[in-house]
């Protein structure tokens, strides 16, 4: 009897995805025939079929693409700053949506997909903590900012980035309740299950926006949950 493995692991081992993040994006986009959960335990000998290549280097791209479409946000020609770039899902999505240039900033290193690292439109800022960001480190003043960070709240991550933005900036940021709520509101496994807690977290972010020199244009829930199952919300901001 063959051993079982996670579906996303098998997809990478078979060469059907470049990374587990990309494998998860494929499954969540419905592109792996017969499967709907990336964590499904699958027979090692099972036949797997990917019906279409992924659009983006990671599932983050699918998240951002949905938000752009849902909110009618245009980024063509924009100079962008992607805070918390990681593998580069947001960066990839921005470029495919017509962004002129993107700074991919992340506190880690070596994570950005080689395709993006080699793209002349992308400036890579690694080992860069956004809280310590100096505007002179950026090759331009961003007109559009995205933010997807973990283990830090938006109140700490966003203001330093906005301080470097051009006049009339806009931002589309991902609110992750598990990193915004207090420890008492985060359940087992780091998941916020109570919708009232999520609503309170979102209200807190909206209430803080004026202090960042911003006003909220719209919000939308991401149809793709976080890796542990957390519901996440995009907030669309503009300069006050």
Where do the PLM segments sit?
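Short, glycine-/aromatic-enriched active-site segment of Class I SAM-dependent methyltransferases
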Residues: 177-194
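Core SAM-dependent methyltransferase catalytic element
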Residues: 224-240
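Conserved class I S-adenosyl-L-methionine
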Residues: 76-86
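S-adenosyl-L-methionine
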Residues: 103-156
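Conserved SAM-binding loop of SAM-dependent methyltransferases across substrates and taxa
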Residues: 87-98
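S4-like RNA-binding module at protein N-termini
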Residues: 5, 16-75
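Short alpha-helix
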Residues: 198-212
